[in-house]
């Protein structure tokens, strides 16, 4: 019997990357490993896929330095750029690449003394309206970056789709056209396709792509990843720690929010919000036990959840429970909860054990 455990498959990870290569065979790949590789373990993921990818993308300089400390030598890109001019010498010494998306970053590059030039990617706002320089500012930024001694001569260009998972929207096509026009004749590498772009917008597969959630076998939409040929890298499991007879009309859990309409058996599973399993979920959220789906009933506790096993169940203490994985797609669980698959994976706490397989 084990407590909450995230089982991570290297074979699934490698399979997904091969599938991505097949979809964009002419593009180089930046593997996104921010947020501890979406909860999968950044050291394991990076070392597993280093030979299959051309670089890594992270959100914080600390994440980049962790990769370097683990012996990763491939290029690493700071997707949000640097937060302080004090970071620039560290970036230069550790051969880290950075996005530039605002005037403050540009001025810091001009004014800081560095031991060697840095590879820079200019982020262009094509319609996400979160980060990036305006379309009418691109030429000025490019000119200033090319004059800066701290910047390597070949500038990269990057942008981000806001609706790549909305196949009936024209907005992605509009963003792509803006990006292509803004970078026309610039000569540097370009990257705009993340997971949604890779799956649904082949015209956006430019010199570089940057897979995130699909690398981990999860769909960027409500559609289960299996329909795209992806295999979940993470299977979240736990164990039944109690099976109890329960009378009709009796409540379960804090606040008595769920009352059984008939005699049944209640299973208690060793996972709760202390492990990162969301607290505010509806009754009926599915889990997988012994080949079938059963519903969560009552409130999620810090360490436990309760499920309705049915009166005639044969489940016993110690049986494995799957919270999500190949048998129960995380997309299905997330949709039932009304949240994103990204949230489920990245919110798991250190209390959840990790097992690396294959």
From Swiss-Prot:
Example GO biological process: D-alanine biosynthetic process
Keywords: Isomerase, Pyridoxal phosphate
InterPro entries on file: Ala_racemase (IPR000821), Ala_racemase/Decarboxylase_C (IPR009006), Ala_racemase_C (IPR011079), Ala_racemase_N (IPR001608), Ala_racemase_pyridoxalP-BS (IPR020622), PLP-binding_barrel (IPR029066)
Keyword match Isomerase: yes
SMART domains named in the record: Ala_racemase_C
Purpose of the protein: Catalyzes the interconversion of L-alanine and D-alanine. May also act on other amino acids.
Protein known as: Alanine racemase
Source organism of this protein record: Actinobacillus succinogenes (strain ATCC 55618 / DSM 22257 / CCUG 43843 / 130Z)
Organism classification: Bacteria, Pseudomonadati, Pseudomonadota, Gammaproteobacteria, Pasteurellales
Gene that encodes the chain: alr
């Amino acid at each position: 019997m084990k407590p909450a455990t995230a089982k991570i498959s290297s074979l699934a990870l490698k399979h997904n990357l091969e599938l991505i290569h097949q979809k964009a065979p002419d593009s180089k790949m930046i593997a996104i490993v921010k947020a501890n590789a979406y909860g999968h373990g950044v050291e394991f993921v990076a070392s597993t896929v280093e030979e299959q990818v051309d670089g890594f993308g992270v959100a914080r300089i600390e994440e980049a330095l962790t990769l370097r400390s683990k012996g990763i030598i491939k290029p690493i890109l700071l997707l949000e750029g640097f937060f302080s001019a004090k970071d620039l010498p560290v970036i230069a010494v550790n051969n880290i690449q950075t996005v530039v998306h605002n005037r403050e970053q540009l001025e810091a590059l001009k004014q800081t003394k560095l031991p060697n030039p840095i590879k820079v990617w200019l982020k262009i706002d094509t319609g996400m309206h979160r980060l990036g320089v305006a379309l009418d500012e691109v030429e000025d930024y490019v000119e200033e970056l090319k004059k800066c001694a701290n910047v390597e001569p070949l500038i990269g260009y990057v942008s981000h789709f806001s609706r790549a998972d909305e196949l009936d929207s024209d907005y992605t096509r509009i963003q792509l056209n803006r990006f292509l026009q803004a970078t026309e004749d610039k000569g540097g590498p370009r990257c705009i396709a993340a997971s949604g772009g890779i799956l649904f917008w082949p015209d956006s597969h430019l010199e570089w792509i940057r897979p995130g959630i699909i690398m981990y076998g999860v769909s960027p939409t409500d559609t289960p990843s299996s329909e795209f040929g992806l295999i979940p890298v993470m299977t979240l499991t736990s164990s039944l720690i109690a099976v109890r007879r329960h009378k009709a009309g009796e409540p379960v859990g804090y606040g008595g929010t769920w009352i059984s309409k008939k005699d049944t058996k209640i299973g208690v599973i060793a996972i709760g919000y202390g492990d990162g399993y969301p607290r505010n979920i509806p009754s009926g959220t599915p889990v997988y036990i012994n080949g079938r789906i059963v519903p969560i009933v009552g409130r999620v506790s810090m360490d436990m959840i309760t499920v309705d096993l049915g009166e005639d169940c044969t489940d016993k203490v110690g049986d494995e429970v799957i919270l999500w994985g190949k048998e129960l797609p995380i997309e299905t669980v997330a949709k039932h909860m009304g949240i994103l698959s990204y949230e489920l994976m990245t919110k798991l706490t250190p209390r959840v054990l990790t097992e690396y397989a294959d």
